[in-house]
Every structure is written in C-alpha cells, then in structure tokens.
From Swiss-Prot:
<dbReference type="InterPro" id="IPR003593">
    <property type="entry name" value="AAA+_ATPase"/>
</dbReference>
<keyword id="KW-0547">Nucleotide-binding</keyword>
<keyword id="KW-0862">Zinc</keyword>
<dbReference type="InterPro" id="IPR003959">
    <property type="entry name" value="ATPase_AAA_core"/>
</dbReference>
<keyword id="KW-0143">Chaperone</keyword>
<feature type="binding site">
    <location>
        <position position="18"/>
    </location>
    <ligand>
        <name>Zn(2+)</name>
    </ligand>
</feature>
<dbReference type="GO" id="GO:0051603">
    <property type="term" value="P:proteolysis involved in protein catabolic process"/>
</dbReference>
<dbReference type="GO" id="GO:0009376">
    <property type="term" value="C:HslUV protease complex"/>
</dbReference>
<comment type="subunit">
    <text>Component of the ClpX-ClpP complex. Forms a hexameric ring that, in the presence of ATP, binds to fourteen ClpP subunits assembled into a disk-like structure with a central cavity, resembling the structure of eukaryotic proteasomes.</text>
</comment>
<dbReference type="InterPro" id="IPR038366">
    <property type="entry name" value="Znf_CppX_C4_sf"/>
</dbReference>
<dbReference type="GO" id="GO:0016887">
    <property type="term" value="F:ATP hydrolysis activity"/>
</dbReference>
<keyword id="KW-0479">Metal-binding</keyword>
<dbReference type="Pfam" id="PF06689">
    <property type="entry name" value="zf-C4_ClpX"/>
</dbReference>
<keyword id="KW-0067">ATP-binding</keyword>
<comment type="function">
    <text>ATP-dependent specificity component of the Clp protease. It directs the protease to specific substrates. Can perform chaperone functions in the absence of ClpP.</text>
</comment>
<dbReference type="InterPro" id="IPR004487">
    <property type="entry name" value="Clp_protease_ATP-bd_su_ClpX"/>
</dbReference>
<feature type="binding site">
    <location>
        <position position="37"/>
    </location>
    <ligand>
        <name>Zn(2+)</name>
    </ligand>
</feature>
Amino acid sequence: MATNSSGDSKNTLYCSFCGKSQHEVRKLIAGPTVFICDECVELCMDIIREETKASGMKATDGVPTPKDICEVLDDYVIGQATAKRVLSVAVHNHYKRLNHAQKAGNDIELSKSNILLIGPTGCGKTLLAQTLARILDVPFTMADATTLTEAGYVGEDVENIILKLLQASEYNVERAQRGIVYIDEVDKITRKSENPSITRDVSGEGVQQALLKLMEGTVASVPPQGGRKHPQQEFLQVDTTNILFICGGAFAGLDKIIKQRGKGSAMGFGADVREESDAGVGETFRDLEPEDLLKFGLIPEFVGRLPVLATLEDLDEDALITILTKPKNALVKQYQRLFELEDTELDFTDEALSAIAKKAIERKTGARGLRSILEDILLDTMFELPGMESVTKVVVNEEAVCSEAQPLMIHADEKESATAG
C-alpha cells in the first residue's frame, strides 16, 4: 500500500497495481497489505477471457463419443434415430480428425466429411445442427442458401457466411476455424436446367460453385466489420479447411426422382411393385443415391463435397405429441411457464394434444408448425389473462383446437366450491 505523506492526504489509499488513488477510481478492494481498483480488476478479467478463448478449443482430448453425442441429441430432438447416429459418428470423427492433425508425426492425412441433411419441412434438420454445436461448444452460424449469389452480383456474398461465424466466435479466428456452419435450403440453389445455358445462373449453379471453395478449404478474406469489400480495408484471414459444413433442405420432388429410378427395376413377373402412396416422403429418402441428387440439379462436385448423407423421416402423430410434451424445452412446457408467471396453471387434455398434432400433419409443416397452432389457440386467453385476477387454471381441450371455442378458464371461487363439494 502506498500513501501520500503530505497534509490531509496522509490516509489516502492507492491501488498497488496502477497507483491511482481511491478518489480516482470507483472502488478500491483491500487485501492483506495490498489494494486493487475496479479498473485493474476489469483489465485482469479481459486478459483471462482472452486466454480462455485462445485455449478453449486447443485440447487434444475430450471429444465426446458418438454415443454421448446421440444421448444429448435425444434430449432435444425426438425420433430420427438413424440420422442421429449418422450425425454423431460424423461429428465425432470430424473433431477427432482435427486433434489427429495437431499431433506431430502423423503421415496419414484424414479428409474432411461435410454432411447433407435431407428431410421434409419441420422434421428437425436445423435443430439437430444447432444442438450439435451446443454439445461441442463451438461457434455456430446459419445461412439461407436462397439469399446467396456469386461474388459481384446483387445479393449476399458466400464469404459473409464466414463473417457470421467469426462474429459468433467474437472475432477469435482460432475458434472460428473449428466451428460449424449450417446452410439451409440448399435444394433451392440447384441448376435451373440440366442443359448448359448461355445466361449465367448466379443464384443456382453459380452459388454451388462459390460454396465449393469454402467447403473444400480455402483462406477467406473477411472484412472485420462486415459490409462490401474495398481495397483500403484490412481483412481477417480465415482458413475454412477445418470448418464443418452441414447442408440441409426439404428437396421437394426428390422422392419422385427416387421412385422413378426404382420403377426401372420393378419390371417382369415376380417383381416387387409398390404403390406410390405406400411410402411417405421420408421413407422414400432411405433409398437415396448420389445420382438422384445430380438429377435434382446439384452439380457433381458439390455432391462430392458432402460425402455423409443423413435422411430424416416424416414425423407421425405420436412423434409430434412427444415433441410437444417431452423434450427439455418442449412447447407445452414453455407455455406452462408463461402462464405460471401469471400465477395460472395451464393444462392440455390428451385429445387436445392429438388434435394439435393432426392439424400440423394436415398443414404439412411438421414440428415447425406446432408453435403457430398453439399461438392461435391461446392468443385470446393470453390477451385477457393479465387483467383477470381470479383465474387459477386454463384447460385446452379438443374443442379449443378444432373449433372456435376458447380454452376453459377455472376461477378461484369455482375451484373452492368444487373442493368443498
């Protein structure tokens, strides 16, 4: 501790690190024979944060096993057992490959295996990718393929994907280079026709070509604050070699291509001929071959950069009911918590849950449509409830889902009389 011996300042305390007096800082914390100010504490915290960020992903051990990854996925994503196994193994191998590359003396180079997720709308593709990033504690970003164009054209440059990943990693290049990128709607960037055209296809095949470089590994020059590149700007160099790319899409119409290919072998006596309606879209995707993706409009090089194929199935009524009620962040639990904040209990009858699931199947929106259905059912109730003090319970029954009827509201006096009776 330093003190000033002159006049009234004899008892003034000073920070032992920066030398500022107690009057120059907001807080001075005392220790045995030393003092530290709030500014020095903040500086120390910044240094520790930077150290933690830099070393966060340098550990060569600790990659979760495929079984561990799959178990965590089970907590958040219902069904899709095959897709979960494929993803768990692929992601485990990817990060094991990175740790293998860090060790000296490895003469065998392990190639990267990017992933293609194919499945109907609302079956869990995006949620799977988000959950994987959460399990592994790596930076994660999502991009919509429909907004991308080739460099130099109006639209979003593909390198903006890397900028978003960099932002997700708080501009820590080391962490960003081990992140996960999920590109949604890749089925919308297919070639407009199978024949070469004189006009340039800047939002279809052109985007596939631009994504190829990122997916196979290149050093992308990213403007630190985003926006368009200009010559006077300094760029951050990000190597995409170790970034895991997961592409996803509904691929509407791909099932017809697969069935058409299957028809060729279902000829002659004794052939197993199935009606088209026998199999759902998700079930048909199980028979997917790379040649089907080429016919759909993906270029061979793009398909080649996505060696791991995981197909997801349609969600049936039971699966949708489970999604509504079982996961940690299930929609029913979320709405029940919202109602708890109003000191009101929210309950759904089994018939209501079944009717909600059927409605989502009819709309062909899968799990994605469940929230909007619940919002429609509970909108008026949530509007009125904050101004009603006596309501203790709200019950959503089948009538509230299938007709214009409102959920049942149980008031405190009704509950008391029912208990007394």
